Amino acid sequence: MGMNINRRSFFGGLAASVAMTGCKGLLGRGERPMLRLGVISDIHITTPGPESTDKFRTALREFRSLGADAVLVAGDLADWGLRSNLKTVKAVWDEVMGGTDAIPLMITGNHDFDGWRYGDMTLDMHMQGYSEDEALKTLGMKACWEEIFHEPFADIRKRTVKGFDFVSVEWHVDGKEKNDALVAQWLKDHAAELKGDRPFFFFRHSPIPNTVSSSSKDPENALYRALQAFPNCVAFCGHTHRTFFDEGSVWQDGFTAISIPSMEYQGALRGYENGSDHRRGGSKCSMPRMPMQGEHADAQGYFVSVFADRLEIKRLDFAAGEEIEPWTLPWPIAAGKPFAAGERAKVTPVPEFPSDAQVALRVYNADTRGGHWTIFWELTFPRATAEGGRVLDYEVRAEMAADGSVAAVKRFLSPAFHKVEREEPETVRVYFDGMDVPESGRYRLAVYPRNCFGRAGRPIFTRWLESKPGKAKAKGMAQQ
């Protein structure tokens, strides 16, 4: 997970944003960067009130104090996709960045087109006195954008800041979401303008397939394949609300890709007993769910300094008011590719439990997320740590005594995986569904601490167990 060493406070969190004085740039070597860039995504603005705008305002103030030449915002500006949402975005920008030369580099995301029709958001929108009658999609995104931001709008744009090109792609390209094939063709048509030793920045809302840890897998994706021809490309994407404490948020191969966290909330990963639910439900996970989105209300972003031989990327946790250990990408990309997934996996620290760590075990009766009564094993143990790193999750395996085989596996996110490390509780508690352990035979539950690349430290074990806890009773309850 993301390094927390050399962490420092750069302001007193959101509550102190008005009094914030900013922080000195982490420039190193006394050099002045050729470009300073603030990078955020998914600001999800609704109303003009501070509950909706303060996080965006705080980020802009920090970027202003650092002397940003431009601020990149990679989509989902307007949570409900309304004209008034977009006007609020512009008003906050003018309030904070007015009088500077900083250039706004903003694009649309799915919410900017369709947020008004997402069920829970439609209800919230109506309750606060707003209506889909002012939907940007209905009124015309191009007309509204140009009226509000006073700049030309196009599905694909190339803008230049201090000699560096920025290629932006909107959520809809030629009337189709993403439309990667058309974007790929645009890149091929403009290759002569973009290729070279100087980096150029590509940004859109959703991740490019086959890159960062939150991206989808599609080896034949046209955009992914097209960008392989541009080793000088640095691609920024948002959408997934993936915390930057996941070291897989940076990827290098034929080009560089970086996932931008959300300014509204960091999402819980799927595939975990305490992970994310799909918006429409259907989760079959057993453990009590992670806190809902409002309780994940963390705001994170980057400040990028471009030098002749490297990119320095500060990780800024605006909610905690802290700067996390930065990422430094040597330039050109051919200089070792230290952020290639395989290389990162080799050097990212592996978490370990304290030498005297033990697992406490008890039976716990509760309902699963699906509303079915069952019996859990409740496991309690001290948190794992990694020097210069973080624990992402804990893998619990039911290991058989007879042959060492693994009869069942469940994974649990560390309670504060998305927050600064000091927020991690000293004691972790997870729930393993007792109906998934072996029917017979001796077994024990082994707990493995893992980093974001799935590398595990040494496990700790429960006592040896003989059978399912309360199996007969659970079966009887299920049949009633």
Model regions and ranges:
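Beta-strand-rich modules
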Residues: 437-454
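Active-site neighborhood of phospho(di)ester-bond hydrolases with catalytic His/Asp-centered motifs
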Residues: 40-41, 71-76, 104-110, 202-205, ...
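N-terminal secretory signal peptides and thylakoid transit peptides that target proteins
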Residues: 2-18
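Extended active-site neighborhood of metal-dependent phosphoesterases/phosphodiesterases
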Residues: 83-194, 222-229, 245-291, 295, ...
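Signal that preferentially marks extracellular ectodomain short beta-strand elements
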Residues: 423-439
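Short acidic, glycine-rich surface-loop motifs adjacent to enzyme active sites
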Residues: 191-212
